[in-house]
Regions:
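Acidic, Ser/Thr- and proline-rich intrinsically disordered linker/docking segments
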Residues: 2-7, 11-13, 44-45, 71-180
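Conserved beta-hairpin
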Residues: 43-67, 71
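Surface loops and adjacent helix of pleckstrin homology
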Residues: 29-30, 37, 55, 62-64, ...
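Anionic N-terminal interaction surfaces
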Residues: 1-51, 121
Length: 180
């Protein structure tokens, strides 16, 4: 997990995560509320979007803010370090996905951070099946193959769910400046 995933700005000024080697983007979801809590109980919150890939979930804030002595603009959750993930569907309020992610040994001594992604606008009819399938593959230690990613572009679209399915992979424009 990382508070500083590599980001770049597209032509419209929107920040996107750079893809890792052999990583494919599956979906993007805007209007997300994100929260994570460190082992020493520092809380980081933001509003923005998530990117779901074959390797990780990345939250990117609409704008970075100073929180707990740090500049917080993004948070990366590698699927292989994710545990205790669950879908929360309260009677009142917005649905969310939450869980734990193991920190690197250099950061917080390898302890767990808790995280929560709240879907503040719209349903979860597209995000949830993709998330559950990724978790199933991870638990079985299966590689996520290209056919799974390609099958997502045939998903049924819920008009109440503003999720964007990637049909083509986002590319870093030649003129884009990498942000940190």
């Amino acid at each position: 997990m990382s508070f500083k995933p590599d980001l770049f700005e597209d032509e419209e000024g929107k920040k996107l995560p750079l893809a890792n080697e052999n990583e494919l983007f599956i979906l993007q979801r805007a209007k997300i509320t994100f929260q994570c809590k460190t082992p020493d109980h520092a809380v980081f919150k933001g509003k923005g979007r998530i990117y779901c890939t074959t390797q990780r979930i990345i939250f990117v804030a609409e704008k970075g803010t100073a929180q707990n002595g740090c500049h917080f603009e993004a948070f990366e959750i590698p699927l292989v370090k994710m545990t205790d993930e669950k879908f929360n569907q309260p009677i009142f309020g917005a649905c969310s996905i939450s869980g734990l992610v193991t920190a690197s040994v250099e950061l917080e001594g390898g302890e767990n951070f808790s995280w929560k992604i709240t879907f503040a606008n719209g349903g979860t009819g597209v995000v949830l099946p993709v998330f559950l399938r990724l978790m199933e593959k991870r638990k079985k230690k299966e590689e996520i193959d290209i056919t799974f990613v390609q099958s997502q572009k045939k998903a049924f679209v819920d008009p109440n769910d503003p999720t964007v399915i990637y049909i083509a992979q986002p590319t870093k424009p030649a003129t884009a400046v990498q942000s940190s």
